[in-house]
Amino acid sequence: MNASGSAPLGANSEVGQLRAVLLHRPGDELKRLTPRNNDQLLFDGLPWVDRAQEEHDAFADLLRSRGVEVLLLSDLLTETLGASGAARIQGIGAAVDARKLGHTLAQELAAHLRGVPAPDLSTILTAGMTFDELPVAANTASLVRRMHHGGDFVIDPLPNLLFTRDSSFWIGPRVAITSLALPARVRETSLTDIIYAHHPRFRGARRAYESHTAPVEGGDVLLLAPGVVAVGVGERTTPAGAEALARSVFEDELAHTVLVVPIAQARASMHLDTVCTMVDHDAVVMYPIIQDTLSAFTIHREDKGVSIRGADPFLTAAAEAMGIGKLRVIDTGLDNVTAEREQWDDGNNTLALAPGVVVAYERNVETNARLEASGIEVLRIAGSELGSGRGGPRCMSCPVARDPL
């Protein structure tokens, strides 16, 4: 513990004892989802918000019962906006887009938001704002204001904030602010950036990677072992993003090896952690259909740059980089139909609380049973509503403090 009684910030693995985690309790942003916009906002359906909140509360309570400090993004954002004028300016600047609103309305809206109390501003930055909710009168000189319908968004909501894994991740003692690939999510990183830059809890936290234009999302990044990072490249993270991340962590001496893992560019496998997560220091649970075909390019830090080898079988390359004889794969033993169903329902997306202890959705009965048969303790949570955005326990959590391995 540090002087404040909090666990030291940082993580060097996926499975070290989890001490503190960043979550986002679903809020009014989910109530903005409609049949007209849910695809654009990356949700497969319209979640029952009250039930989603109940499920998320149970998830957070489970973590607390295991000694994990739960930090809620909305609370941190409200505290930050209330304490820092610079944070307010940064948040408003990211949310008010003159290219969309025009100069007149953008100026009027920004001026209004500068006087909004921190709790209300926090809600607007996460849940968005419609033209009906504008304080600016319809007879303004803004053509945009006159021509838009009342329910259209002036500031888009951020329903995918639920998945805190993607907009930042910790590697060693540093935090990486990512670059999200799709328009519906781009502004999320402005909020995590505000919190890490201005909240007292993170004072002095150094950055590992930030502000690159090439997309890198946290769901594609696995800390396989101290000094060894796997980065999925597929629907979200690009090869250029993976290369930029590798060079950044090498320059900061946060890793000696980066494995770049091509994955299918499909909704079902949008991130590496939708098909593979670590459940012990030498074990993964993996979508069985890809087990024999997943490959990796190995990037090593060298004295005068980097070297790239491969592609080689992922399991072989990972074990070699980790310095172990073999990476154990939990044999889910599922037929193709059941495997596909449970992968779609985030059966492979587990959150490790410690070596051999994971949180998983209860609905993936077969995968959970096989994990337990292999000696893994599975802590089950409900996710019938949380899963409608295609994310499981790992997606919904950003570890900010783990014990080192």
Curated annotation (Swiss-Prot):
GO biological process, one term: arginine catabolic process to ornithine
Keywords: Arginine metabolism, Cytoplasm, Hydrolase
Active site (UniProt): C395
Any one GO molecular function term: arginine deiminase activity
Annotated localization: Cytoplasm
Main location: cytoplasm
Keyword Hydrolase: yes
Enzyme class, spelled out: hydrolase
GO cellular component, one term: cytoplasm
Pathway assigned in UniProt: Amino-acid degradation; L-arginine degradation via ADI pathway; carbamoyl phosphate from L-arginine: step 1/2
E.C. numbers: 3.5.3.6
Catalytic activity, reaction form: L-arginine + H2O = L-citrulline + NH4(+)
UniProt-listed PANTHER family: ARGININE DEIMINASE (PTHR47271:SF2)
Protein family according to the UniProt entry: Belongs to the arginine deiminase family.
Designated name of the protein: Arginine deiminase
Organism name: Rhodococcus jostii (strain RHA1)
